[in-house]
Every structure is written in structure tokens, then in C-alpha cells.
Amino acid sequence: MSFKKITEMMRQAERQSKQKALDFEQKLFEYSYKNAAIKIIIFGNLTIKSITIDPALIDPEDKVTLEEMITEAVNEAVGDVKAKYDQLMEEAMPQMPGLF
């Protein structure tokens, strides 16, 4: 395979992966935490669109537990979206025999 052909294939792969990344950033993901006690809607670019909390969790006497649950739920959602992004980028890069 010629160097020119390899270079063009790499450029095409880069364009495709950039487009996939842009599409992913605009995609919405919905996560439920603790049997939907906390629901998070998050974009692929990790911007939170909304957080919904089951009213049964709201105890004015125990604010700390709710804060901890929200923090844990957000961290899980962010981690899941990052993992999906990493998987998408891994799949987007073509396997070119003889290069690596």
C-alpha cells in the first residue's frame, strides 16, 4: 500500500472520528440511580441537562445523605458516558494492518 493511500485513509478516519465525536457530544443519555430515585439526563459532552429527585428522598433533617447520593449518581453517569465515548472512539479508528 502506498504512503499516499495510507495518508488518505488516515485523514478519512480522522474526519469520521471527529464527526462521530461531534454527534456523540450532542447525544442525550438518561441514567437512573437507586431504582430511579435520582434520574440524570446528560449530554455526551458531559453537560447535565436535568436531575430529577424522588420527593421521598428529600428529608430536611438529612441533607448530607441526599447530597452524597446526588454526587454519586452524577459521577456514575459521567463515568458511563466517558466509557461509551472511549468505546466509540476505539471502534472509529480503523485497524490498519502493518501500521501498528
Swiss-Prot record:
NCBIfam families in the record: DNA_YbaB_EbfC
Superkingdom assignment: Bacteria
UniProt cross-references to Gene3D superfamilies, sorted A to Z: Nucleoid-associated protein YbaB-like domain
GO molecular function: DNA binding
Organism in which the protein naturally occurs: Mycoplasma pneumoniae (strain ATCC 29342 / M129 / Subtype 1) (Mycoplasmoides pneumoniae)
Pfam families membership: YbaB_DNA_bd
Protein name (database record): Uncharacterized protein MG134 homolog
